[in-house]
Amino acid sequence: MVSFKKICVGTLLAATMLGIGGLMPTAEAGKLEDIQARGTLLVGSTGDYKPMSYLNKETGKYEGFDVEVAELFAKSLGVKVEYVPTTWKTLTADTMSGKFDIAICGITRTFARAQKMDMSHGYLLFGKTILCRKADAKKFKSEADLNKKSVRVMVNPGGTNEKFALANLPDCTLLVHPQNAEIPGLIAEGKADVMITETMEARRYTRDDARLAAPLLDDPFTRNQFGILMQKGDQEWLNYVNFFMEEKDMDGTLDKLEDQYIK
């Protein structure tokens, strides 16, 4: 026979558990679930960085190493890619506001970005270097050769190229041009002497335009890696992004894309 005392204790315990359960917050869907429910992966891209992520104005389509990665990433989720335009100047604000799920367009991993946003493990090793006219290649052998008032250095606004120039070339004549993809052509035409860029981009533009040279390509000023940028706070999403990149590195996909777009 069950005693009244046992019934009371059991009832009290059940009521207590029910009360606790009622106070516990309902688990919210994370980014991973949101994307799969939506059916699209929102990808932020500046669309101005050959060979990483470049908007081909003739076809209206994005091209490059990071574009291929984004497409494969979306495929792993069973969704399609929708590109969201951003700029180097607004990249941080756009990422922090959740304008897109990831940003992947040749984004340098930096401490400043890591403090405000989540960033994937690094991929592809590169460094800051210069692009100049082939006729001027012998003039620029070191950073000191750039840091002169007579040298017109052109950069795009808001990114690490501008930050590098401001920090390391205080005596140069710094020119800021809004469209990164237009700067190599302006250098070739003599509108500026040097573009601060990265080894990946410099290699591509010297291949595409015989008027250009990258004399310091094998001895860059810095050593960096790219990363995928995300709004801070969703550890499950960050884990999935890192897992995907590790898998694609392990199975040779990243090496194949590097051979196709960079080497």
Could you tell me what each predicted segment is?
Residues 53-59, 70-79, 142-149, 161-177, ...:
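Ligand-binding cleft/hinge of the Venus flytrap
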Residues 71, 75, 80-145, 213-214, ...:
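Acidic, polar ligand-binding/catalytic clefts
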Residues 125-129, 199, 203-246, 263:
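Periplasmic-binding protein-like
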Residues 39-45, 63, 143-158, 174:
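Short loop->beta-strand "edge-of-pocket" segments that line small-molecule binding or catalytic clefts
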Residues 29-106:
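Extracytoplasmic small-molecule ligand-binding "clamshell" domains
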Residues 90, 107-116, 163-167, 186-189, ...:
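A ligand-binding cleft/hinge motif common to bilobed small-molecule-binding domains
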Residues 68-76, 134-136, 144, 150, ...:
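Extended ligand-binding regions for polar small-molecule ligands
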Residues 67, 82-93, 138, 175-189, ...:
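Short helix-initiation/N-cap motifs at beta->coil->alpha
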